Every structure is written in C-alpha cells, then in structure tokens.
Amino acid sequence: MTSLPNLLSRSDYLLALPMLVLSGFAVAILLLDLVLPKGWKRWNAALALAGLAAATMSLAKVWQAVYYIETPESKRFSGFLGSLVMDRFAIYFYLLFIVGAAVAILMSIRYMEIEHEDHGEYHALILFATIGMMCMASGMDLILLFVGLELMALSTYVLVGFLKRDKRSNEAALKYLLLGAFSSGIFAYGLSLFYGLTGSTNLTEIANKLAQRMADNPRDPIALLALITTATGLLFKIAAVPFHQWAPDAYEGAPTAVTGFMSVAVKAAGWAMLLRIFLFMLWPMREQYTPILIFVAVATMIGGNFAALTQTNVKRLLAYSSISHVGYMLLGLVASDGKNSSTGIKGILVYLAVYTFMNLGAFAVITSLRRRDIIGDELDDLAGLFFKAPSEAVLLLVFLLSLAGIPPLAGFWGKYYIFLSLMETGHYTLAVVAVLFAVLGMYYYLRIANAAFMREAVDAEPVKISPSLGAALWISALGTLGIGLFPEVFLRIVNWSLALSGDARVIGLLR
C-alpha cells in the first residue's frame, strides 16, 4: 500500500503552508494559555496576530509559486491529488479572511477583558475558523469543501456562545448550532446526490459529467433535487432569505467582535464556496438555478431592508442590513451570464472587500460602547456620541454612509458594479428594484446617525478607546476611504483575482 508521504510532495505542503502556519500558532496559543498568569493574557492576542502575519508571509511564498507556473491555459497551483488549489481567486479571499480575523482580534482585546472572558481558546478558535475558510476558498473537492465548512462552523458556534454568563449569548449559540447542523445536513445530502449522479467528488469531473447529463435531460429530477438541496445549504451560510433566521439572533447574542468577524469573514467564506460551486461545478445548470437566484435575491432585499426599519438594537439592525447586502450580491451572480459580462463577479468581489472594512468599522464603534454595566448595543446607547467622542462619531458616520452606498465612499463602488452588471445583461427591472431598496436602506442607517449626532446622551459615562480598538477603527476607516477615493488601484487587484480554477471558457470569468 502506498504510504501518505509517497502520495504527497513538497508542493502539496507548500500549497497548505498558510493553513499549517495558522494551525501551529493556534495550538501554541492553547498551550501558552495554560501557563500564562492572568495579567498576561494579552499575549494570546499578540500571538494570534503574529500567526496571521506569518500566514500572510507564507501566502506570499505560495503566490510566488502560482505566478511562476501561470500560463494562458493554467492559472492555478493544485495539490493533494487535485482536491486543493491555489489560484488568484483563492489568494484574494485568503487576504480578506486574514484582514477580517486580525481586525476582529484587535477589537476583542479590551472587550473580552471587560467581559472577563479573555481566554486563549477564543483567539485559537478565530484561527481555526480562518483555516476552515481557507479550505472553503481553495477546495476543488466536495469532501474538502464540507470539512472546511464544518471546521469554520464549529469554531463559530463556540465563539457565538463564548460569553458563558450571558443568556443571550447562550441562546444565540444554541439556535445557531441547531439551524447550522440542520442546514449542513441538507447541504451534505445535496453533495451526496451529486456524487451519486457523477461518481466523483472533484468539481472539474462533476461539471463535465453534469454538462453531458443536462444536455440529455435538462429536467433530470435527481439533478434538480441535488441543485435545490445544495443551494439551500449554501444560501443558509450567507444568510439569504428565507434561510436567514439564525443571523439576527446570532449577531445580537454573540460578543460584538465575533459579530463583526461573522458578518465579514464568515460571510466571505460562504461566498467563496458558493462562487466556486455555482460558477464552475453547477455552471451546466445555470438555466435551472438562475430563476431560483432571482427569487431569493429579491426576497432577501425585501426581508432584510424592511426588517431593519423597525430594529432598536444596533447589532440586530446591522444583521438585517447584512442580509439585504446579500440580496444585492446575489444579483451580481444572476448577471454573470458567462458570455459578455464578468462585471457581476467583479461587483461581488469589490462588495465583499469594502463590506469587510465598513462593517468591521461600524462594529468597532459599537464595541467601544461596552463599559462597566453598559452593554452598548442599543440605539439609546449611541445617543450623544458626537458630544462624548466626536472623532469616533464621525468615523461611524463614514461607515454608515459607505454601507448606504453614498459616493465617494467604498460602498458606492460595490453597488455600482452590481447595478452596472444588471444593465449590461438586460436585467433592467432588477436594477430598478435594487436601486429602490438601496434608497430605502439609507433610512435605517440615518436612524443610527441621528442617535449619535442629534440626540442627547442618556448617560455620562465617557467613551474610552483602547489602542488596539483604535487601530481596528483606523484600519477600517483607511480601507473604507482608500477604496472609495482611489478605486482604480483596488480594481486592478480585483481584475487580477478574476481567475477561478478550472476551465475559464466554461465559467466565463476570463476573456
């Protein structure tokens, strides 16, 4: 029997280097936490940030390998018997995950001390979740994608319930676990059906065999059932209506830094896997899944925007806001016809990046309001923020206006490319509907701004910004303003990343 070392080469280990680095640092944090005295717990956060920095450097090494092997026919570096790939698409998402994890850790340091929950396993779980996300962005095999999804999900279940003394946190974790396990079961059932139909777990082979099968019978009932169950699992992970019920409760009950992490990095991972599966494996079924996506996208915009209008808890409001943004991004997928437009996919990638900065910034402001006996996540807690912390209030306004899509901030460019892609592909009605909902969304963002700038403070407790939280705020602000004011630099990066492993002629992303 062939041994594992003989099956794997040095290039396989190089491909997995960022994940191996993060695994090493996560284990080191768990061991270090056993011997660190209570006053030294911040070293856990420092070690986690060092691990993310080391993973970034190892990613540069992997990118170098991808760069040197690129040809017009091949733009990927594959390993582990073809189940794991590193292409520009994966590198782009790796960077989003690392930025999201790093800013979340910076937000957490003081917050978790106030909550008396500054344990090493918290930072280790963020790193383990990031490893799962990397598998989801790089996977070209159904089994690896599912393992990555579950590693991320199990880590985030624990992170949501990390405030053991908080009933809301415990309740949110239980709901998230039960609904997440149910959706994972449906997703696994869909994947098993595709395996039964094609006899393979490799995305390339499944795509080829599906193309033959759909050419013979476009209404194949087993293939349609596999599509629906797989799509259900994927849409749950990105919190699309009607599979969004977990998001408001999980976002409200989780530690605020974890909420920020889930709203950007976890969501980006779900999108990375969704794009790989829909744009490549399921591309032969695009005529079957496009009507489903249109229905879900419109329902998501309706549900997210209207539910956000009545919320008084800021974290819950931003949860519904996050759901509405998923609707816009799904329209980008609808508009990616693979013939004459890659603008929709460009819009999704831009949207995910700018959303990372502006949403983390908004949650960083909410994190700063947690002090003594004040939770800080209600609209009343924001009252008079401008008079107590004017610079922080101005930054909050920048993040809110960017979320609303106001030019020249970063959020404008995400919506612009989504709407442009709809116009390019003749979806004029969807474009008008999306614009109307974007205008509606301004109302609930202005409600938050109104509380911060126009209302009197309900408490005299000062707002103090720790150095780590200040760093998180300014990283978010620089990303939001930088992409908004200098979009051409960032768009070059996005255009570079529009290379998805597989046959580009099939998925239509390269021209």
Swiss-Prot record:
GO terms for molecular function: NADH dehydrogenase (ubiquinone) activity; NADH:ubiquinone reductase (non-electrogenic) activity; quinone binding. It catalyses: a quinone + NADH + 5 H(+)(in) = a quinol + NAD(+) + 4 H(+)(out). The keyword Flavoprotein does not apply. It is a multi-pass membrane protein. One of its GO terms (biological process) is ATP synthesis coupled electron transport. Its EC number is 7.1.1.-. The chain crosses the membrane at residues 15-35, 46-66, 89-109, 120-140, 142-162, 177-197, 221-241, 264-284, 289-309, 317-337, 347-367, 393-413, 426-446, 471-491. It holds the Pfam family Proton_antipo_M. Its main location: membrane. NDH-1 shuttles electrons from NADH, via FMN and iron-sulfur (Fe-S) centers, to quinones in the respiratory chain. The immediate electron acceptor for the enzyme in this species is believed to be ubiquinone. Couples the redox reaction to proton translocation (for every two electrons transferred, four hydrogen ions are translocated across the cytoplasmic membrane), and thus conserves the redox energy in a proton gradient. Belongs to the complex I subunit 2 family. NDH-1 is composed of 14 different subunits. Subunits NuoA, H, J, K, L, M, N constitute the membrane sector of the complex. This is NADH-quinone oxidoreductase subunit N 1. It comes from Koribacter versatilis (strain Ellin345). The lineage of its organism: Bacteria, Pseudomonadati, Acidobacteriota, Terriglobia, Terriglobales.
